Every structure is written in structure tokens, then in C-alpha cells.
Amino acid sequence: NWITKILKAGQNIKERIKERASREELKSSKWMPSCCGSAPVLKETIFNEKQLNTCPNDNCQFHYPFPPRSRFDHFYGKNNWEEIGTPRIPDDPLSWPNDVYKKKLAAARKLTNQRCSVLVALGERDGVKITSFSINSAFIGGAISIESAEAILKACDVAIQNQTPLIAWSEGGGQIMFESGLSLQGMTRTVLGVNEVKKNNLPYINIYTNKCYGGISASFA
């Protein structure tokens, strides 16, 4: 009868879930699921200096996330840039119960070795000094917190002080929900910061990467 069919379907789903590798197993494995529906692929065929985190299949060419420090190494050249310190903001301004937000921040910082989702750099490319910032989607999806917004404003200030172009690599979502309207205000301030760069007749280049969502494209990007 129909009840037996539902129970059987549920059991099949449980068995399929058990067969899937855990996050820890996927992270430690040399193999990863293919982005274009083929058999599993070796990570080293995608994450290398030639492919630069892009699928080698000509019919796919899927772009995987690119951590900021790796991106800066590729753009400026290794040891040819410096990481700029950014303002620190007290965590969890809305005091979420059970420290749920603080725990998420702690896990993201351990995973990425970053204070927030945005990293700022100053370096040289072909003899030209350039300021840049990059968003790390591994840090709570690349969501923009108050501290992330302050980091972007710092990048704008550094560009103006040093009279350099400002380049942004946008990868992530919009404002972080754990800070509600406060993070929304921060994103508004980033627009003002970028406008100051433009008022100083300095080039501002935003590069959309995978994945980039509406909150970012509606503000500083």
C-alpha cells in the first residue's frame, strides 16, 4: 500500500545519504565531485597555477572560489604585496542567544585565517602601485558585516592616501543577517567610500567573480 511505499522511499533516501562522503572526507580527499556531471576529478587538475581554480573542460570552465591571499599572489606576484590592517569591530552587536553568531565567526576565522570576509592589500603590478580588496566566500558566504564594510572603507582610504587605483574582487552575498540593519548601513557607507575614490579621479575597477549576489552588486560593486 501507499504507506509501505513511503516508508521504503524514506529508507532508500537514508541509505543514499549514508553513501555520500562527509565534508571532512571530501576536504581530505584528493578527489572531488565534478562540476560538469562527469566522473570525480582530481583536485590538482583544477587547483593549480595553470587552471587557476577553473574547470579544464572547455565546455564547462566553471570558476571555483579563489581565496584572497591566493588571488593577491597571482595578481601582484608572491612577496610583492602587503596585507593592510583593518579596523576591528566588537563581535555580535545584537547579542544573539546562545552565542550563535560568535560561534559562526570563530569557525569562519579558523577556516580562513581572516578577521572578516574582506582582505585588503597594497602592492605593485608592472611598476604600478595598486590597492585592492577581495571578498572570501568561505567566510560565512562572503557576507558583508560591519567589520567587512570598514575593511572596504580602509581600502578606499589607502587608495586615496597613496593615489593608487582601487581594484575589487567581489565574491559573495549581501549584508550579513546576524547584524540586520547595522550591516545594511555599513554597505551604504561603502558606496560613499567608493565615490570618494572616484572624486579623486582614481580608477576603481570591480571584478565580479563566482559567486556574486545582489547585495554586493547593489552597493560598492
Q: Which sequence ranges carry the predicted segments?
A:
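Glycine-rich beta-to-alpha transition loops that act as phosphate-gripper elements at the mouths
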Residues: 207-213
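Short glycine/serine/threonine-rich phosphate/pyrophosphate-binding segments
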Residues: 213-220
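Terminal-region recognition feature
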Residues: 1-202, 211
